[in-house]
C-alpha cells in the first residue's frame, strides 16, 4: 500500500464509523461521489474490498477491519501531532 493518502485514511475511517458514504461526506465536507472515489482508490490499492453493501447498509469486511485498526492509529497520531504543535506555538520563547 504505497500510494495511500491521509485523505483516504480519513475518508475510510469516517465511512466505517458512520456506516454511510453520505454521512461521512457530510462530516468531512465532501461530496458523496468524492467519498466513493477515495474508497474506490483505497480498495484498488489494498487489492481487497473494504466494505460490503447489503441493501442500503454498509458493513466493514474482514480486510476493512484490519485496515481500520491501522488507519485509526494513523489518524489519531496525526491529530495528536497537530495538538502538540499547536501547544508549542502557544509557548513563549526566549532565553532565560
Q: How should each PLM-predicted stretch be described?
A:
Residues 13-30:
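Short helix-boundary/capping micro-motifs
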Residues 5-8, 32, 64, 71, ...:
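The N-cap/first-turn positions of alpha helices
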Residues 56, 86-96:
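Interdomain hinge and pocket-entrance segments immediately C-terminal to HTH DNA-binding domains
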Residues 1-11, 17:
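Extreme N-terminal segment that seeds HTH/winged-HTH DNA-binding domains in transcriptional regulators
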Residues 43-60:
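A short LG(V/I)-centered, amphipathic sequence patch enriched
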Residues 45-46, 50, 67-89:
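Alpha-helical linker/hinge and terminal dimerization helices associated
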Residues 27-28, 39, 46, 67:
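Core residues of bacterial helix-turn-helix
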Amino acid at each position: 500500500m504505497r500510494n495511500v493518502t491521509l485523505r483516504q485514511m480519513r475518508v475510510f475511517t469516517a465511512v466505517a464509523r458512520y456506516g454511510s458514504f453520505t454521512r461521512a461526506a457530510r462530516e468531512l465536507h465532501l461530496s458523496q461521489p468524492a467519498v466513493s472515489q477515495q474508497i474506490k482508490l483505497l480498495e484498488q490499492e489494498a487489492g481487497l474490498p473494504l466494505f460490503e453493501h447489503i441493501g442500503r447498509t454498509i458493513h466493514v469486511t474482514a480486510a476493512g477491519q484490519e485496515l481500520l485498526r491501522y488507519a485509526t492509529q494513523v489518524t489519531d497520531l496525526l491529530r495528536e501531532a497537530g495538538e502538540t504543535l499547536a501547544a508549542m506555538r502557544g509557548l513563549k520563547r526566549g532565553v532565560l
